[in-house]
């Protein structure tokens, strides 16, 4: 079982992931990875020497093609338990962001096959025990 926790602050060195809840034209923005049949919120791993905000901006561009947007931090989150991105099960930390995308590049240049703009949240999630909780927390904090 996974446990998701939320924090207002944490040491920057702990932040290994950025996840970006995104909307465009009042629709949810989700990605479909080429190797999966599920949908996910844009996000990914922080690269060495990269700020966590730069991670979020890079991942948002790579996974959605977003080129004009606003982005703001929501909170820090952690996940305890084994996941596709963490096989040790130890607590891992990330920064949750919210972005409003106003313009997309015409082609994707990543492992993402397709970007979806949805009126409703999906039913088939890549990370069903994590990402719905991140969205609920962003909602609770007044971002959605």
Language-model segments: what does each one mean?
Residues 77-105:
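Active-site-adjacent beta-strand/loop module that shapes the phosphate/pyrophosphate-binding cleft
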Residues 15-17, 23, 34-36, 41, ...:
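Short connector loops at helix/strand junctions that flank enzyme active sites
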Residues 23-62:
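Conserved Nudix-box catalytic region and its N-terminal flanking loop in Nudix hydrolases
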Residues 28-29, 103-108:
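Short helix-loop capping/hinge motifs at secondary-structure junctions, enriched
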Residues 1-19:
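Acidic, metal-coordinating catalytic segment for phosphate/diphosphate chemistry
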Residues 96, 106-141:
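NUDIX/MutT-family hydrolases
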Residues 67-76:
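A short coil-to-beta-strand element that immediately follows conserved catalytic motifs
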Residues 20, 73, 97-99:
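A structural signal for short, well-ordered beta-strand segments
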């Amino acid at each position: 079982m996974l446990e998701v926790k939320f924090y207002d602050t944490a040491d920057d060195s702990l932040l290994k992931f950025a996840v970006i809840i995104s909307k465009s034209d009042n629709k949810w923005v989700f990605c479909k990875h080429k190797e999966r049949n599920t949908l996910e919120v844009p996000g990914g791993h922080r690269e060495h020497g990269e700020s966590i905000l730069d991670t979020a901006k890079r991942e948002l561009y790579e996974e959605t093609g977003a080129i004009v947007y606003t982005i703001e931090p929501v909170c820090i989150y952690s996940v305890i338990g084994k996941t596709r991105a963490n096989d040790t099960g130890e607590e891992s930390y990330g920064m949750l962001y919210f972005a409003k995308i106003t313009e997309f590049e015409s082609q994707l240049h990543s492992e993402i096959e397709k970007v979806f703009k949805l009126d409703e949240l999906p039913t088939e999630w890549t990370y069903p025990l994590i990402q719905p909780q991140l969205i609920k927390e962003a909602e609770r904090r007044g971002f959605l």
